[in-house]
Amino acid sequence: FTAWQRGTAFRAGANNDDSCTASRWVLLSDGNDIVDVVRSAGDVDSSFYSIGLDVETVDKKFGIVQIIENINTGALGGKGNTPVSLSFKAKVSGGGKLDNVKAAVIAWSGTADSVTSDVVSAWNAEGTAPTLATNWTYENTAANLSVTTSFADYKIENISVDTSSTNNVAVFIWSDVTDTDAGDFLYITDVQLEPGATANDFKRETHTTTLSQ
């Protein structure tokens, strides 16, 4: 989360559901003004920044998604043949209620790059994964990652992207909690999706390289 070209905070209108925020990440939420998005400190040993999701409207699910362009999906290997692995760092703070964070790789089988960026059709009850919009499919079964108040590495490995006619792939990370307090925070950084059955250390790029992409 080194590139914040659109600003370093997204609040009051700029934080609505399906709003583009930092580094091409799209904010998703069960309604508008559910969380503010702010540039926050990353992990002390590596990450300069993280994305901070600050609860404004309580008892609603929220998350972020990044959609990979069709031309770049080839870097993930042969669709249906090469597994992919997702890794990232996360932590929470606040009243201790953000205790169910999940992540998934999802696939788009509609027209290449003509994606529905609001990938959630229905957020559903706590503990039940959101229903995805038409043409989006979960490629792994999302489980509670038990995120704590300290940054830690989370890995979901050996994911088979086997949806027929996959044209785009996305990473979706969300809070699956419907009992939150105002001021609860979810911090996420160092998100990496790569080909292979295991996740490797995060590959750091210069700020200039990130901005050029």
Feature roles, as predicted:
Residues 2-213:
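Extracellular and organelle-lumenal recognition/adhesion modules and their flexible linkers in secreted
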